[in-house]
């Protein structure tokens, strides 16, 4: 189940929870974030590489490239046994911005995006089939949990792909992790 919690950036212990897809979409649209549910029903093998994932979802990728002019696409696929899961998690947990507009399409698993917009933090739990955009220069971070299990197609408007400018803020450490967030929803 996708979910959104909107917090004041100085009150990570209190937030307004939305679990209805239309409500999530409407709240995110207010800050210029696109949130959609796409079909993610291609069967991927456990060892599917980037080329296999991109081939399986080529129609969706082509549609997005045509619509937004994306110049680069990659796949991030992590599982609990990934040897660099801790390194990746720490990198993505640091608040950062990108100069370009980016889109994430979750084709397996889930992850938690935090969008820091003005005085609010929007925690968006993305699940299989969710597509989320992050507007250029939006401060954000991402948590995949201690034992990640997700496959996500990432699309960028620049040929360089994922290039982050880290803010140096420690705000991410004050908000619930993916594991804490999901436990609270249960």
Model-predicted regions and their roles:
Residues 85, 113-115, 122:
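Short, solvent-exposed loop/turn segments at secondary-structure junctions
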Residues 75-99:
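Conserved short histidine dyad/triad with adjacent acidic residue
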Residues 143-186:
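Double-stranded beta-helix
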Residues 1-70:
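N-terminal leader/capping segments at the start of a protein or of a new domain
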């Amino acid at each position: 189940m996708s979910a959104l919690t909107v917090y004041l950036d100085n009150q990570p212990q209190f937030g307004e929870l939305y679990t209805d897809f239309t409500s999530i979409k409407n709240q995110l649209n207010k800050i210029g974030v696109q949130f959609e549910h796409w079909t993610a029903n291609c069967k991927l093998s456990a060892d599917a590489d980037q080329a296999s994932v991109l081939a399986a979802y080529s129609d969706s990728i082509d549609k997005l490239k045509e619509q937004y002019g994306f110049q680069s696409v990659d796949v991030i696929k992590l599982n609990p046994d990934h040897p660099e899961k801790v390194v990746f998690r720490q990198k993505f947990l640091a608040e950062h911005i990108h100069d370009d507009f980016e889109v994430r399409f979750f084709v397996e698993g889930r992850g938690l995006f935090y969008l820091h917009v003005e005085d609010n933090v929007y925690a968006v739990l993305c699940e299989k089939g969710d597509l989320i955009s992050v507007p250029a220069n939006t401060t954000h971070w991402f948590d995949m949990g201690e034992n990640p299990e997700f496959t996500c197609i990432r699309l960028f408007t620049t040929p360089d792909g994922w290039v982050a400018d880290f803010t140096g803020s420690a705000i991410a450490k004050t908000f619930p992790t993916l594991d804490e967030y999901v436990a609270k929803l249960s």
